């Protein structure tokens, strides 16, 4: 197989340094409302464009992103045109202490590898900063199994096969879709895959197949099928539909991926479809739509040490599109040690069909849901009317399903979750609604969970609480 190098730039090894930019070859935004330095060196700040579909008015705001590599903790300085009087750095778990160094500047220390969000004035017009460890394993651009994308912008679609690696060099921006099918496929690097050039469902290709057989020609930004798949360190910026789709996969690792969505609705962060033995960790995911969404069926999933942010949907959405192939279902799903920065701007009631929740579990299509665990989930911002947990066994009829029968749930534990809820009982509600006695919700346990609002249960029992541990 002949090697493919996108752009005729010769690969080079970066000189050893304590701090260096991860965005070489990318011009900084001239009108950015932030400037950033790390270890005294300027870091380019990139705009993630204003949403073009769904969010409107004051909610349709751009945000910005900066990243750098460092081998050790480093001082970061941020100048914010909006001022720093109300500035906060999230997630709160990071316990970032800022020092004011000027009228519009703060300094703080970041250790690799981590991601934080700087908010001068709330959730709108924020700055995402990622501190990465330096790359030590840049592949050989001449390797016939490596698709090497050099710094700069490149508009094309790519298809990957077994034993291939797509490497996005620092400063590389691939505008298009990436599809891969096979065994031992890797996507990595410090560059980006961008969907910002296309409107809602107007993408250049890929696959978008629903259980009912519906295929959307726009496709996904990244669609992967197969076994032994790794996606790490890259950015996915903007999307015309779903961002990263793992479809019919097993033995998958997604690590230190930054999904910078919000361009359109239906831009799900990571969809895990018909897949097993998948690990997602150390990643930042912002989307207008659902951020983590197991679909069709999903077994043996671990999502840990991630940061989630949804603008108009659900942080976790499990199910809705369900397909119990060969007895498969949603089993052994673990979500732990996760920071949820913000929930949907669009508030509604959990009884509504398109409810927007922190956790929405929807067994449908005669599919079994068993052994789900949400452990150590932290909510940095709670707004009036947010919904904490919504579980519905329901019948869904349309192009997405093959059955009118609802699903069922047996075993869902929520553990070590403490919500700072300054509002009334209608905020961070819990709602359980079974379709009927044949499609029950069973074994929902709250273990050391505090701060949630009113609990409502329809044709089922309320969650079984375990005492708060002091």
Predicted segments, located by residue:
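Classical eukaryotic N-terminal signal peptides for Sec-dependent ER targeting/secretion
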Residues: 1-2
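Bacterial N-terminal signal peptides
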Residues: 5-15
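Extracellular/periplasmic carbohydrate-active domains that bind, remodel
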Residues: 17-470
